[in-house]
Amino acid sequence: MEGRASILLRGFQLSLRAALGATIAYALAEAFELPHPVYALVAAIVVTDLYPTETTNLGLQRLAATFIGAACGVLLWSAVEPREWVIGLGILIAMAICHVCNFSGGAKVAGFVSAVVLLSYGEHPWVHAWYRLSETILGIGVAWLISLVPRLIQLDKKPDKPPTT
């Protein structure tokens, strides 16, 4: 069982990595003049972990889910006028595809992205989907780079793998 100091240190290091990644991702998205830098910020936070392998896995899940959700949203928008039931259908299809393709960890993200694309007021959905994907890739990329920085203090003997339960 871990001591309180170890748990606090783990939490601090994870918080520091997430904050740093989110800040850098947001600043880069603004520098690239992406329309919604907050998506880069969120992506960096959501995939950040103390273990590089886990950050990679979370990033791949998030990236696949974003792509699936964006594709579902765009394809549905192209086929049917977006209405409440179409948005629900997009969420259902995007999440189901994630489960079938073994990306269950990203299913909710796929549903969210599909809905956001279908609700892309004032923008063409292809453009909106492209920006969401770009912002997500940026955030995940920053998180992946930060995961390569060694931890401040090693907490276990295998720093590149999460503990097994």
Short names for language-model regions:
Residues 1-165:
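Alpha-helical transmembrane segments and their membrane-interface boundaries
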